[in-house]
């Protein structure tokens, strides 16, 4: 399909400052046109066909796996990311710098390598998997493996968004809480968590979108069984392999729409949780 | 030993070390119930550490701390029933003024009505009625510190501790808040200890001043006692401007001041300047004149080269019509010297 843009007048662009012009052109080329093209491609089909492709049982199951596990991975990292960030900001220990740079490793590692490594370590015979297998839990090539890969690749986000907020916290506010009779747990829930919550949510949102889009590591550690541990991005890839471009773009569009809705919700939560910065 | 109920705070032989730094050393201190005491000293003198030890925010290496007669040495901060106010307010930024003040009350599981009533009472006490729904970021520094004070007072502490409470405020607000704190204390009567490095602040607000230096108490007394009868050279020079002269100085020869101690301390306002030679004066020359507002500072050079700083009221300065390079005669009205075993 050829994409014909209506002949628009671009004189308005010349009235903008340079920074604005660059922003518009850059975002148009990188973001807007590709996204619009995706939707147009899907929209070129009849409505009934779109609905049919979007709601076919194998796709619906894949959405559930993708979004369910992505949210779970993001939430897990929300909890453990705060704990890791806490350790990094509140304690001094030898090798702290090295430990700190290790956190970013999931960003630097090619995702296929990550998937392969996790699949090896967590397989029935792997270093860690062999201890879990006797309990009847298989990690590699199941949903647990998918979750594990998603947790791995989205690990750094919450740590990095929460760290600066923890550094900003006044230790004195915690001392004040204690002097007013708060126990350590009351101090955490009432004094420490609320100010870092916007950062936690921002990190969770980033981790979530990263997990939804993840392909390379999951395709390796997953069994890729439809209705079981097949995720939507892998399903899209399979559709493409079968030259089913329509199916691939429709599923892709659904993925995008869902992600947008969830990100809006998390953003709204984030705004609400930082309402006091007046 | 039995402790007197009327004693609000008793600190007994308390020491605290941070690494190799001895922050507080063998300090004894008694604060009467209902009094307002200032811990005064330069930075690093241990005054803030002593306050934090009393609060339980630090643990002493040795010694005991008694609050209203009970041994509180091993009690945690949350059990000590103290109110603590920090230099930088330490308000909960995500909570409104009302919620900040209610913090301690809500932890104590009071009924909603009771909390609301108490919060309104405190807002009125700290003159912030109507600002209860604001967030700390929407308040000025002075207002924030008053919220911090209300928050600390809300739980009716037995002891109120303030760590440089006005240190982060600008000069005008600081002065206002000072006299306000004094008035507030006269209303509330809670045993209060506040830390300051500003001797004027200590003089204005406190019933008793504890002067600290190098982790030790130099002197305890009323503002007048501290000023008129400083116990050590440190107190003498910390509590106000002072000239330090050798006892061999020219100026003491005419007056017949005789002291075995090698150093003599002389307040600038205790130096009399005259145009004509009168008995017991020595000649000197004006080096410089500095206008300090209600006082004028004259720097005078004695014949032995020693430069003295003298303060005189504006009227006196006008009468004398002093000019730089002018020949004058000076006389110490009052001087003080201390036994040798001290260090500044």
Curated annotation (Swiss-Prot), chain A:
Protein's cellular compartments: Cell inner membrane
Bilayer-crossing regions: 22-42, 67-87, 102-122, 139-159, 188-208, 217-237, 246-266
InterPro entries (alphabetical): CysT_permease, MetI-like, MetI-like_sf, Sulph_transpt2
GO molecular function, one term: ABC-type sulfate transporter activity
Induction context: By sulfur deprivation.
UniProt KW keywords: Cell inner membrane, Cell membrane, Membrane, Stress response, Sulfate transport, Transmembrane, Transmembrane helix, Transport
Top-rank taxon, per record: Bacteria
CDD domains (alphabetical): TM_PBP2
PROSITE patterns per record: ABC_TM1 (PS50928)
Main subcellular location: membrane
Topology versus the membrane: Multi-pass membrane protein
Ranges of residues in domain ABC transmembrane type-1: 63-266
GO cellular component: plasma membrane
Family statement drawn from the similarity comment of this UniProt entry: Belongs to the binding-protein-dependent transport system permease family. CysTW subfamily.
Function text: Part of the ABC transporter complex CysAWTP (TC 3.A.1.6.1) involved in sulfate/thiosulfate import. Probably responsible for the translocation of the substrate across the membrane.
Subunit structure: The complex is composed of two ATP-binding proteins (CysA), two transmembrane proteins (CysT and CysW) and a solute-binding protein (CysP).
Protein name according to UniProt: Sulfate transport system permease protein CysT
Source organism of this protein record: Synechococcus elongatus (strain ATCC 33912 / PCC 7942 / FACHB-805)
From Swiss-Prot, chain B:
ABC transporter domain sequence ranges: 9-239
Binding site for ATP: 41-48
Record keywords, A-Z: ATP-binding, Cell inner membrane, Cell membrane, Membrane, Nucleotide-binding, Stress response, Sulfate transport, Translocase, Transport
Catalytic activity: sulfate(out) + ATP + H2O = sulfate(in) + ADP + phosphate + H(+); thiosulfate(out) + ATP + H2O = thiosulfate(in) + ADP + phosphate + H(+)
Enzyme class: translocase
EC number(s) stated in the UniProt entry for this protein: 7.3.2.3
Name of protein: Sulfate/thiosulfate import ATP-binding protein CysA
Organism of derivation: Synechococcus elongatus (strain ATCC 33912 / PCC 7942 / FACHB-805) (Anacystis nidulans R2)
């Amino acid at each position: 399909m050829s994409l014909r843009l209506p002949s628009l007048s671009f004189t308005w662009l010349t009235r903008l400052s340079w920074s604005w012009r660059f922003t518009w052109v850059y975002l148009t080329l990188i973001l807007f046109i590709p996204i619009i093209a995706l939707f147009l491609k899907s929209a070129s089909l009849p409505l009934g066909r779109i609905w049919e492709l979007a709601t076919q049982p194998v796709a619906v199951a894949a959405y559930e796996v993708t979004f369910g596990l992505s949210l779970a991975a993001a939430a897990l990292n929300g909890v453990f990311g705060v704990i890791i960030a806490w350790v990094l900001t509140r304690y001094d220990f030898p090798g702290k710098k090295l430990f700190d740079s290790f956190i970013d490793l999931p960003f630097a590692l090619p995702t296929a390598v990550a998937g392969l490594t996790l699949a090896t370590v967590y397989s029935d015979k792997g270093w860690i998997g062999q201890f879990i297998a006797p309990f009847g839990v298989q990690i590699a090539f199941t949903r647990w493996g998918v979750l594990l890969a998603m947790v791995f690749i989205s690990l750094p986000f919450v740590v990095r968004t929460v760290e600066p907020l923890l550094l900003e916290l006044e230790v004195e506010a915690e001392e004040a809480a204690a002097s007013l009779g708060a126990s350590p747990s009351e101090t955490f829930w009432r004094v420490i968590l609320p100010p870092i919550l916007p950062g936690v949510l921002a990190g969770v949102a980033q981790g979530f979108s990263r997990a939804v889009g993840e392909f390379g590591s999951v395709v390796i550690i997953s069994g890729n069984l439809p209705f079981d541990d097949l995720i939507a991005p892998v399903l899209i890839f399979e559709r493409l392999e079968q030259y089913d471009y329509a199916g691939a773009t429709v599923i892709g569009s659904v993925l995008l729409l869902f992600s947008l809705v969830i990100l809006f919700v998390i953003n709204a939560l984030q705004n609400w949780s930082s309402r006091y910065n007046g | 030993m039995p402790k007197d109920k009327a004693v609000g705070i008793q600190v007994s032989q308390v020491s605290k070390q941070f690494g190799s730094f001895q922050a507080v050393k063998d300090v004894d201190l008694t604060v009467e119930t209902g009094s307002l005491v200032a811990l005064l000293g330069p930075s690093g003198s241990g005054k803030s550490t002593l306050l934090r030890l009393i609060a339980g925010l630090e643990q002493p290496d040795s010694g005991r701390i008694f609050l209203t007669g009970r041994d509180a040495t091993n009690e945690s901060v949350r059990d000590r029933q103290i109110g603590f106010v920090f230099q930088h307010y330490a308000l909960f930024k995500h909570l409104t003024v009302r919620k900040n003040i209610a913090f301690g009350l809500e932890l104590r599981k009071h009924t909603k009505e009771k909390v609301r009533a108490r919060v309104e009472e405190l807002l009125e006490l700290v003159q912030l009625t109507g600002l209860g729904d604001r967030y700390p970021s929407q308040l000025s520094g002075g207002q924030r510190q008053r919220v911090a004070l209300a928050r600390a007072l809300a739980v009716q502490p037995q002891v109120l501790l303030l760590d440089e409470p006005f240190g982060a405020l600008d000069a005008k607000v600081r002065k206002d808040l000072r006299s306000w704190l004094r008035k507030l204390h006269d209303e509330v009567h809670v045993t209060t200890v506040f830390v300051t490095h500003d001797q004027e602040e200590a003089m204005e607000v406190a019933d008793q001043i504890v002067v600290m230096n190098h982790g030790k108490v130099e002197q305890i007394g009323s503002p007048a006692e501290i000023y008129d009868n400083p116990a050590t050279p440190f107190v003498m020079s910390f509590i106000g401007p002072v000239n330090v002269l050798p006892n061999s100085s020219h100026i003491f020869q005419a007056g017949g001041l005789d002291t075995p101690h090698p150093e003599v301390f002389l307040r600038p306002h205790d130096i009399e300047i005259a145009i004509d030679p009168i008995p017991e004066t020595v000649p000197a020359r004006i080096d410089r004149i500095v206008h300090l507002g209600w006082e004028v500072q004259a720097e005078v050079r004695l014949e032995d080269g020693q430069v003295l700083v003298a303060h005189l009221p504006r009227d006196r300065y006008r009468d004398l019509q002093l000019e730089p390079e002018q020949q004058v005669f000076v006389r110490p009205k009052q001087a003080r010297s201390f036994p040798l075993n001290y260090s500044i």
